[in-house]
Amino acid sequence: MRYTFSDEKKATTTTTSRAKSQARLLNSASYRRAARTTLRHSYGMGMWRAVALLACLSATHAALFTEGGAVQNGKDNKANKYVEFAHDDKINKEDLLKYYGKEVEQYKDDDSYMEYLIEYMKSHPVPAQFPNFEQEAEQEHQDELNQWLEQLMNEQELLEPANAAVKDAEQKAPLAPVHHKQVAQKPAQEPFDLDDLLRGELMLENEIAKESELKKTQEKLSEQTPSAKANVESLESAMQTATGEPQVPQKKGQNEFVSFVEQEPQPAKQTISSQTVDKRRLATSAEYSGSAPRYSSSSLLLLAVGTVMCVGLIGTVAGGTYYYKNNRRTETPDDGEYAPYAGTGPGFRKNKGNKGDETLAYKAQLHQYQQAKQKIICGEDAPGIIESDGEDGADEENNYSVYECPGLAPTGDIEVCNPNFAAQP
């Protein structure tokens, strides 16, 4: 009961505190200012309606009275015009589909379709051929030739009265003396032939084209580098020194005419061979000098860098191998270390040539081991001598360096006292 009463009391206190805080807020100046500044509900809804009306009015004004609107320059029904166009297009499309659909149904068969094509071709004339530009160029050239021939004929007609006057004057002139020879009169000129004129013009055009090509080649030769000119001059001078005659430029066919008319005396075979050898030597030397490899600075630099890199690589490999071997020698123990301290070790065994001492020492150790073993097995107090094998006996017959010591005490009388172990358990 105590707990429920206390809870109810706490709830009443919280509600009273909340009511007091709300009353304070309502009476505060900040709440009053906020109430004054905010719009009423009805007033705000009216403003939104006014804004919506203004937007509608502006849209209608833009649709009617602007450049793209319906009412501009007396076009009152422009807005409905596009609808009419769309409707007309729809009607036309339907009509075309109906017409072409029927037409296709009518001419499904091959024979009927061929008849339809023939009728269509008869009703529609064949269009004119496309222009042929090559034929037009030939026609223009022919027209120019005809004009040129007409001009020539007109000039001849104009010159005919002058020629007639000259002939009349010659006839009226006194006769020439007898000792003068009569000059043969020229035959009358035949009329011009168009084919001959065309051939002559073609020949002239070919000659003009050849001359232009020759000029181009001469210009290219003149534009060659000075090194090529120097090589040509050196070759000409070499040929001049070899033959003894200056190299003069000759016309086409001049060399053949001179060799045919003025036959030079042929020298002996030895002289011919010597001259040809000299010429060949000069030509080959000039050719080799012109075709010798010329290294640029970049290629020389690349060669130098490559050689330096190769030498460095070889040096590093050689140094690495030498260092590796030397380091291993220092790390591994030397075989000669064992020799100065004792007669054992690998150095002693390698350096010693006589093996007699080794065999003797080995046999002595073996003999001692066998004696100790026999004593342990038999349990004898006195030291007994055990005979070795036949081979050992045969080897020890002549061996007097190893002797048995008889003055040693027997091993059974010796007592060993170890302080770590108790005498009695």
From Swiss-Prot:
Transmembrane domains' residue ranges: 300-320
Region ranges (AEX-3-binding): 205-424
Segments of skewed composition (Basic and acidic residues): 1-11
Tissue: Expressed in a variety of neurons.
UniProt superkingdom: Eukaryota
Alphabetized UniProt keyword annotations: Membrane, Transmembrane, Transmembrane helix
Pfam families xref list: NPDC1
Subcellular location: Membrane
GO BP field: chemical synaptic transmission; positive regulation of anterior/posterior axon guidance; ventral cord development
Cellular-component GO terms for this entry: membrane; synapse
InterPro entries in UniProt: NPDC1
Region of interest: Disordered: 1-20, 214-251, 334-355
Annotated membrane topology: Single-pass membrane protein
Assembly and oligomerization: Binds to the RAB3 GDP/GTP exchange factor aex-3.
Stated family: Belongs to the NPDC1/cab-1 family.
Listed name of the protein: Protein cab-1
Organism of provenance: Caenorhabditis elegans
Gene expressing this chain: cab-1
